[in-house]
Amino acid sequence: MNTEILGVVLQIFLLVVISYPLGKYIAKVYKGEKTWSDFMKPVERLIFKVVGVNPDEEMNWKQFLKALLILNAFWFVWGMVLLVSQGWLPLNPDGNGPQTPDQAFNTCISFMVNCNLQHYSGESGLTYFTQLFVIMLFQFITAATGMAAMAGIMKSISRKTTSTIGNFWNFLVLSCTRILLPLSLIVGFILITQGTPMGFDGKMEVTTLEGQEQTVSQGPVAAIVPIKQLGTNGGGYFGVNSSHPLENPTYLSNIAECWSILIIPMAMVFALGFYTKRMKLAYSIYGVMLCAYLAGVGINVYQEMHGNPRIDDMGIAQDNGSMEGKEVRLGAGATALWSITTTVTSNGSVNGMHDSTMPLSGMMEMLNMQINTWFGGVGVGWMNYYTFIIIAVFISGLMVGRTPEFLGKKVEAREMKIATIIALLHPFVILVGTALSCYLLAHHPEFVESEGGWLNNPGFHGLSEQFYEFTSCAANNGSGFEGLGDNTYFWNYACGWVLILSRFLPIVGQVAIAGLLAQKRFVPESAGTLKTDTFTFAVMTFAVIFIVAALSFFPAHALSTIAEHFSL
């Protein structure tokens, strides 16, 4: 047990220590300052020349969003065409067939919005061609899209008064060539040394320890897993994700993959401070996020390492903790850490089955996604926190009788309306979606049965499975309580639309707020200015997040995870 806890502490220590210099480097990249990666400039110039883009041309917030949305629309069409025709495309040694239109819609939307929800099993539902030219490609592009959006907001904040927020295409390409690609190569090398396969051969015929013949899927796994983690994508090459021994072979590969999930989201907070020259603000935000993360880790590690009371009642020893749904080579502690790390971000990859975690652990996993502001996805995580800063500034200003201001710009009704809509959208789509699925189960069971039945677990846990699915979609996370039968028309289309709404409406709103504030006259700090980089304001922001984001979900948790906990 002590060794497992030491492993948890080591991984968190590595994250905190490395996120600071990486954040400084990211800020330099987006500012266009000299870095060690300048050797990539010829490649970047070639990309801009081929695409026909001038990277030095500044965009206003509307042009910025237009470019972002056009890019995503193009890749959606690209992905749909390849997925429904993959059975006839090259690099398919295992002869996997095409996806159905509803499954392709869900898959394409899911990977396009950085969610990576998988209603298929990777080794049988895709080919090597679509793994590389849809899945891996989207994992780079969607991560870079979120990072580019944050870079635009950082640029707008750093200027006193401006009508432009940078060039989307420039930020997008820099995110890929200077940040995501180098880190992916490092992590990929580590995985290859640990035994992760990298090749294009078909399934292997092997003889197991029992003397039975078995086929084992392989492929370009080591090329895809690093960006899966670093881009907070999470879509596994294999159906069981990083609990698969070829996707995550050893404890060292587990450390590398778990570290990869959170390092860029953590670094982006420091990048904000370096870019805007407001390190106190960055420390304040980082502190709130880190405290929330550590609280979640503490709860889940305790829950999983102390085992299941039902098994205790049977007189069975649980020296290694609750091992249901966990890999023996990794242990309960590493799985608990991963479960929080993957849900405080929009990653969603797993090294054990969340469906088998203790009820309160499942609640913490869901609350992380329902709050959706603790580090979050690369780029968009801080942007969600930015929404609550705007709300907290407005409320604080009203409480103390001061004009609401954020970094020298007045926060007025227009910005507040946008921020409120964004904040309320998240609980709305989760709770309405869950209510709809419960209604269909209760009042139209014939429809559910026609789709093969959804639930393998009735009662409290069955509600949790539906609740988790919509939560995961709305948070662009992609993990799931996999007792839910989700490859159906209802879940493919319902989740697909939740994914679209929950990805693009917040980004549009957050970039719009940044663009509107950037155009306003800069107001110098005075004795009456509400400081947003203090401990007091950090606590205020946390309170607003807890009240608006977390409390909305407690009635549903009372009927699902909490009720299940007290039934043990």
Name every feature range the model reports, one short phrase each.
Residues 66-76, 138-148, 257-269, 381-395, ...:
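Hydrophobic alpha-helical transmembrane segments
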Residues 68-82, 174-197, 261-264, 273, ...:
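Selective recognition of specific alpha-helical transmembrane segments in multi-pass small-molecule
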Residues 126-200, 252-282:
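A conserved hydrophobic secondary-structure block that centers on an alpha-helix together
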Residues 271-276, 398-412, 512-533:
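Alpha-helical transmembrane segments
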